[in-house]
Amino acid sequence: MNTLVLKIDAILSKHLKKQLASYTISSQNTYVAFAAKKNGVTVLLYKSGKLVLQGNGANALAQELNLPVAKTVFEASNNSQDIPIIGSDEVGNGSYFGGIAVVASFVDPKDHSFLKKLGVDDSKKLSDKTIQQIAPLLEKQIPHQSLLLSPKKYNELVGKSKPYNAISIKVALHNQAIFLLLQKGIQPKQIVIDAFTSQSNYEKHLKKEKNHFPNPLTFQEKAESHYLAVAVSSIIARNLFLDNLDQLGQDLGYQLPSGAGSASDKVASQLLAAYGMSSLEYSAKLHFANTHKAQALLTK
């Protein structure tokens, strides 16, 4: 996916809206004055005058619309690493036990050598042991914002008749992590989120959040493989999640597994037998199917 960002004046804005009048779409982002989608390219015109085109055909559409691409456009391809970037990622959403860790990190091109020496560019190949060794080094060197939503708080917020669902809670966490990082004076050229939902769905849930920022977002699947900033966030978040999982286990006197497989069912049933439902409310995400499976194991 390519992202083109440029500044346009009132005359060009009016011309753009006229050209894309039959392609308009809704946007829940309060900073967006006009939104459209044509040929698979999303067009967002912000109230500030900033125009963003996102999609593989962004360049072609910009030319079709006679936009001043050559002079004022900034282009970021999937593997663009020569600009300062904020990358955001989360860990723990697929695990029954443990909370959700979300981290936003700011990586400048001058950090690349340091990160590659640590093996950050191959973050998916790193073992948990290695992650626990290098995460403290990243936390010390790279500006970042970490958030951890405990299982207990997660269960208070997520579920039927509660404020959030499994997607909207991640939107809230990513948005808050990025917002808080920007408050530190960070000035990225691009903000990338490891995509867990569509941009339109993200913006729908974002509407109810208190804090907002005008910077456009890039959504990329498996973003940690394309952006060092996202890889850094993935590593720090994984370490934060593992620390939380270990602490919860120590509190209960059980080794809590990561993931949502049969091992989680077994440990959950043991916790139910030992302490009752309150132990799962404290350590696990109750709306997962593992809860019912654990209860069923007790009846056998």
From Swiss-Prot:
This is Ribonuclease HIII. Signal peptide: none annotated. It comes from the Bacteria. Residues 83-300 form the RNase H type-2 domain. GO terms for cellular component: cytoplasm; ribonuclease H2 complex. GO terms for biological process: DNA replication, removal of RNA primer; mismatch repair. Endonuclease that specifically degrades the RNA of RNA-DNA hybrids. Belongs to the RNase HII family. RnhC subfamily. A divalent metal cation binds at D89, E90, D194. The keyword Nuclease applies. It catalyses: Endonucleolytic cleavage to 5'-phosphomonoester.
